[in-house]
From Swiss-Prot:
InterPro entries according to UniProt: MetalPrtase_cat_dom_sf_prd, YbeY, YbeY_CS
Keyword terms: Cytoplasm, Endonuclease, Hydrolase, Metal-binding, Nuclease, Ribosome biogenesis, rRNA processing, Zinc
Protein name (record): Endoribonuclease YbeY
Source organism: Pediococcus pentosaceus (strain ATCC 25745 / CCUG 21536 / LMG 10740 / 183-1w)
Cited PROSITE patterns: UPF0054
Top-level taxon in the UniProt lineage: Bacteria
Single GO MF annotation: RNA endonuclease activity
Taxonomic path: Bacteria, Bacillati, Bacillota, Bacilli, Lactobacillales
Keyword Cytoplasm: yes
Compartments (UniProt record): Cytoplasm
Length: 156
């Protein structure tokens, strides 16, 4: 996978940036995504994610992770199948609040790295069409999330 990370905080430990890349690569392989699939992850503070949450979701508070899925199927562009195969699928962007990562890790009694990995996997699953708004959706997403985390080695 082509994973781009952006650290708007300019404070994140390089090992955590590696963790993001590693766990998303692992999750992509777990879901059998094409190796050229693209995703971006931006780390930020609460004030920035609060602004994004308010603007795009109409929720006036910071949150831990926001997923922006990208649908590459633009109806205005007509491509033959060969051309479509050559263009990598960009599944979207994740925005993660490092402040929320720290708060939630402390509250839940586990490491910052475990919480960061969890939020990456959680957001990644959203970008791949999983949701938890309805009970039946939760029953698909949450066990898969746990399965990926455990297989990667970030157990609770």
């Amino acid at each position: 996978m082509d994973i781009q990370t952006f650290d708007h905080t300019k404070e994140e430990n390089p090992k955590n940036l590696e963790l993001i890349t590693d766990i998303l690569e692992f999750a992509g392989n777990y879901l059998h995504l094409d190796e050229e699939t693209e995703i971006s992850v931006t780390l930020m503070h609460n004030d920035e994610i609060h602004q994004i949450n308010k603007e795009y979701r109409n929720v006036d508070r910071p949150t831990d992770v926001i997923s922006f899925a990208i649908n590459d199927a633009d109806e205005d562009i007509i491509m033959d199948p060969e051309m479509a195969e050559e263009i990598p699928a960009n599944i979207g962007d994740l925005m993660i609040s490092v402040d929320k990562v720290a708060e939630q890790a402390e509250f839940l009694g586990h490491s910052y790295e475990r919480e960061l990995g969890f939020l990456c996997v959680h957001g990644f699953l959203h970008l791949n069409g999983y949701d938890h708004m309805e009970k039946e959706d939760q029953e698909k997403m949450f066990p898969l999330q746990k399965e990926i985390m455990n297989a990667y080695g970030l157990k609770r």
